[in-house]
Swiss-Prot record:
Protein role: Member of the two-component regulatory system BceS/BceR involved in the regulation of bacitracin resistance. Activates BceR in response to extracellular bacitracin.
Primary location: membrane
Keyword Transmembrane: yes
Lipid bilayer topology: Multi-pass membrane protein
Name of the protein: Sensor protein BceS
Residue span(s) of domain Histidine kinase: 121-326
Entry EC number(s): 2.7.13.3
One Pfam family linked to the record: HATPase_c
Cytoplasmic compartment spans: 1-12, 56-334
Keywords: ATP-binding, Cell membrane, Kinase, Membrane, Nucleotide-binding, Phosphoprotein, Transferase, Transmembrane, Transmembrane helix, Two-component regulatory system
Organism lineage: Bacteria, Bacillati, Bacillota, Bacilli, Bacillales
Subcellular location: Cell membrane
Length: 334
């Protein structure tokens, strides 16, 4: 800040130094003027000027120091009161811009809330004809057509479910209900929902649940597992998907292993990025690049750590590591 102040006042300093140099020059060329007396006077003036500069630095920079340390949280009360007309102009400008930003942010927030509410209402409305469609498909007797329609229905259902959770995920902390959850019924339900797709692709499941329960939120854990299972089914053909749970130290781990196409090593660091699909199968129009991104985002407030190991062309293993009980103390009282 001192450097900035000196740069700002460099014209004043230059004018003062020029004036002192001029006085010394006149005393030097004019024998009638005592050079020693003038030199002493210049010394006193410089000393006084330095003290004056220091005083002005303390006074004039207090306001701007508060601006520099301002956290940009739109709270203008954190800024020091202006003491000069120019500081008052700056303060009024900042206050005006801040108020404008607050109003703009409020309008955008309201618009986003309305958009979210409308979209969620639309999704819930669409679920009614989807349910009716599912009942109609179940009554069909032609197996080939029934299988194809069931698959397309499932795709629509999963996309709507993903969209619904995407809109809710911003407020996930308000929606958590952490409790001990039995893994078997939760996993079996998710597999049952994918049954028609799995039959169509010839995919089975090998389930070994040594650890029977985990501490989490049932709805959001089901969503995370759903994303991992749909990925495993999507990229596998005529194979088994292994689902295992076990204890590792004090923590419970759940693994979902498929024998699908695997992930290219250069893609592994990016698979949880929003919108990322693949660099090897970039033409894949069915992939949205949102499933794993949302799974990772939902896992964070649940303190679930997701690891991935993959061998390109051989398969992928996703591992969910669940927190121990006391790790949830800062999230919710269990």
């Amino acid at each position: 800040m001192i450097k900035a102040f000196l740069i700002e006042r460099r014209s004043w300093i230059a004018a003062f130094l020029f004036q002192q140099a001029l006085m010394l020059f006149i005393a030097f060329v004019d024998p009638s003027i005592s050079f020693g007396n003038v030199l002493y006077m210049v010394y006193l003036c410089i000393l006084f000027f330095i003290i004056f500069l220091w005083f002005r630095y303390r006074k004039e920079t207090a306001f701007y120091k508060s601006l520099k340390t301002w956290e940009n949280n739109l709270d203008v009360t954190a800024i020091n009161e202006p003491e000069t007309p120019f500081e008052a102009m700056v303060e009024r400008s900042i206050a005006g811009q801040t108020e404008h930003l607050k109003q703009t942010a409020a309008r955008h927030r309201l618009a986003l809330e309305n958009e979210k509410d409308e979209l969620m209402a639309w999704i819930h409305e669409v679920k009614t004809p989807l349910t009716a469609m599912h009942l109609i498909i179940d009554r069909m007797e032609e197996k080939a057509l029934k299988s194809q329609l069931s698959y397309e229905w499932l795709r629509i259902h999963l996309l709507l479910d993903q969209q619904l959770h995407q809109k809710r995920i911003s407020f996930i902390e308000n929606d958590l209900s952490v409790e001990f959850i039995q893994l078997q019924p939760l996993i079996f339900k998710e597999i049952k929902d994918l049954q028609s797709w799995c039959i169509q692709k010839g995919i089975g499941f090998d389930i070994q649940l040594e650890a029977k329960e985990v501490l989490s939120d049932a709805k959001w854990l089901a969503f995370i597992i759903r994303q991992l299972l749909t990925n495993a089914v999507k990229y596998s053909e005529a194979s088994e998907i292994e689902i295992k749970s076990f204890q590792k130290g004090e923590q419970t781990q759940l693994q979902v292993k498929d024998c699908g196409r695997g992930i290219d090593p250069k893609d592994v660091p990016r698979i949880f990025d929003k919108g990322f699909t693949s660099t090897t199968d970039h033409h894949d129009q069915a992939s949205t690049g949102m499933g794993l991104y949302l799974a990772k985002k939902a896992a964070a407030p649940l303190l679930i750590h997701i690891d991935v190991e993959s061998e390109f062309g051989a398969g992928t293993v996703f591992t969910l590591t669940f927190p121990i009980r006391n790790q949830f103390e800062h999230v919710i009282s269990v």
